[in-house]
């Protein structure tokens, strides 16, 4: 019997020894279990940790990551310390299930980003220590799990430029907020209004130039260096910031001071002066002054884009916004883009944009406005032969857009424009005269061989364009060009050719002299008369006169009716622009 009891005790001791990792200290003080594994050279969280552990300390090791399985089912864990390791990664939901955890210490690691899913499950967390890391970004919802329970938040000695201020503003139970030695340059207005239990706010050694006034600071004690303070009064530490001493910090100057160690960094006349020694009258601001307001182009065609610019100066730097001609405030959307430097881009203009845009510059000292005028040019409306408004025909406005026409449009207009007499260098194009369109000034032929009628619109007095038709064709293959003379024909052959040319020239000169001699000797012969005949045509480059055929010989045929009259153009394809022969 005694031997059986001894065996049971031995097996129990061995079982407990297996649950405690090597080189770790396991302390069992009923009903709690504490596991201490400091400076043991751990590379990861030991998998043999008792799942009923209440306090787990793994400080001064070489753990590089927190895995999802490391703290699985450890629902009794209350205090977790992972300080001074080399942790750079936290797996998503790595702390899920730790509903009893009250304190998490991860200072002195290599964390760079805190994502929203890395701290999930810590619904009862009260102390979060993340100081001495390399954190430069914290997602907005990272603290949402414990925003109502957190009491101590330490983010000191990181690379933070901003914080999830909206989440911090909801931490109504927080007592200590430590944000010193970061790169923070802005604090949202009203961030601390609801933090009535806040006892200590440490903003030492950041890049703050100003602090927003807050009702919570009315009874605050201001310190330039962290010191002990009573629990009943808020202590604000802001030493080591490049304070800009203007009217925005006048509220801080009126608070109770404890020493004269803090100085101003700007403006220039207050540089290096003790903050608390400056008179209240010297904390002044300058109203905004608009130095530049202009538009890239004052006249804008409807649908085009335009850029408006506005610059202003003042102390503090004024914020710039714009108002439409109807007085509405301009916001960023798919049509308008407003930049921080005061530039406004309108990507697509409408007729409602015609008028005066107002640039408004404002700061703590006042408001300044300036008007920028934009004149909208409406798109031309086409008129049919009945005098009623109609939509413009979808067509090409210039050569560069000719390739954008759809195949359906090409098929529709190809029946109205015909091509004939195709050669390697030219083609003759026929199209209707379009006499029913009033005021046609010319016909424009483009590289895609689409004929456009350009005329004056009767209502808007603007130039309108209508596609008469398009045609597609292929020219005939070009004949072979002259080949280069082989080298064997040069030399003596060239001398013979040159000599022949000289002899021929002498013979021609002799024949001319003989003809002149006979002409003078004939005396009184009939004078030869030249008779001009044949068709005369004029080359016109790129565009033709649609109203009349100038510089052409009038035909003796009877005139045709206007409805049946056709136009014709000869296109010389070797030219950079088409050369047209107008035949009416």
Curated annotation (Swiss-Prot):
Which membrane topology term applies here?
Single-pass type I membrane protein
Q: Which SMART domains match?
A: IG, IGc2, LRR_TYP, LRRCT
Cellular localisation? Membrane; Synapse
Domain (LRRCT) spans: 241-287
Whose protein is this, by species? Danio rerio (Zebrafish)
**Leader peptide range in chain numbering:** 1-17
What name goes with this protein?
Answer: Leucine-rich repeat and fibronectin type III domain-containing protein 1
* Mapped LRR repeat ranges: 52-73, 76-97, 100-121, 124-145, 149-170, 173-194, 197-218
Which residue spans adopt a coiled-coil conformation according to this UniProt entry? none
A single Gene Ontology CC term:
membrane
User: InterPro entries from the entry?
Assistant: Cys-rich_flank_reg_C, Ig-like_dom, Ig-like_dom_sf, Ig-like_fold, Ig_sub, Ig_sub2, Leu-rich_rpt, Leu-rich_rpt_typical-subtyp
List residues in topological domain: Extracellular. 18-494
PROSITE patterns, A to Z: IG_LIKE, LRR
What's one Pfam family the UniProt record gives for this protein? Ig_3
Q: Write out the function statement from the record.
A: Involved in the regulation of excitatory synapses.
Family label? Belongs to the LRFN family.
- For region Disordered, the annotated ranges are 393-414, 539-564
Disulfide pairs? 310-359
Keywords assigned by UniProt? Answer: Disulfide bond, Glycoprotein, Immunoglobulin domain, Leucine-rich repeat, Membrane, Repeat, Signal, Synapse, Transmembrane, Transmembrane helix
Q: Where is the composition biased (Polar residues)?
A: 540-553
Entry's PANTHER family? Answer: LEUCINE-RICH REPEAT AND FIBRONECTIN TYPE III DOMAIN-CONTAINING PROTEIN 1, SYNAPTIC ADHESION-LIKE MOLECULE SALM
- Ranges for the Ig-like domain? 288-375
LRRNT domain: which residues? 18-51
